[in-house]
Amino acid sequence: VDYWESNYESKGDYIPRADLGGPEAFKKGVAAVHARGGKIILYLEAFIVTRKNPVGLEHPDWAMMDENGSFYTYYGRDRFYLMYPGEGSGWTEYVCGLAEKMVRDYGVDGFHLDSYGCQWDWKDYNPKHPGATDPAKFNKGAVDLVKTMRERIRKVNPDAVVILECCERTELLDVCDGGQLDAAAWLYSPIKVLNEKPWVKEKKY
């Protein structure tokens, strides 16, 4: 069930749907799952927002641009912004604050950050983001985003977790609670895909 306003593709503010009872019903649903011994891990986009979502409308200045000064598209579609996590952008503060608020207000147990385990080496040409053409700036910002989110939600709930979709970068794995193989891996051989990761032989995780 898509439980955010206004639909699945509206990524950015994550407001529980009014026709399903709104925030209060969502909170009660989480409590009911907890009463049965379950946990609620929310899907959250840390990389993209919908351009027509209130967050996208208000803060295109947080998004990354290509070398021609145009906003990056996402798989060829221009309905999303790709958000920059470094200096000059308020994205990290916003999304980490949002995660903290959802743990506090709804009692959720953590977040699954879609695709964030493989977002790496982006070059950003947005002039509002100093030095962002250096991919190292994005990389540091991505690590800081995951680390900050985990620290903030654990101040509210010490057992809260941050899980990443994809598990390509040890720098990101070092600051989260777990990684999920990318969805495509399940179409053929998850074990083969896992064993191809450069860090598997180190037996670090």
What are these model-derived regions, one by one?
Residues 1-2, 41-45, 112-114, 163-165:
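A cross-family glycoside hydrolase active-site/sugar-binding cleft signature
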Residues 1-6, 105-109:
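Catalytic domains of carbohydrate-active enzymes, especially glycoside hydrolases
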Residues 4-7, 46-50, 117, 166-170:
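Active-site-proximal loop/turn and secondary-structure-junction residues that shape catalytic pockets
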Residues 4-7, 71-76, 122-128:
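Short amphipathic alpha-helical segments, especially helix-boundary/capping motifs
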Residues 6-41, 130-131, 135, 139:
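Aromatic-lined substrate-binding rim segments of carbohydrate-active enzymes
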Residues 10, 51-55, 122-124:
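Short, solvent-exposed loop/turn and secondary-structure capping segments
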Residues 17, 24-27, 31-32, 39-106, ...:
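Active-site-adjacent "subsite" loops/lids of carbohydrate-active enzymes
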Residues 82-181, 186-204:
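Active-site neighborhood of glycoside hydrolase catalytic domains
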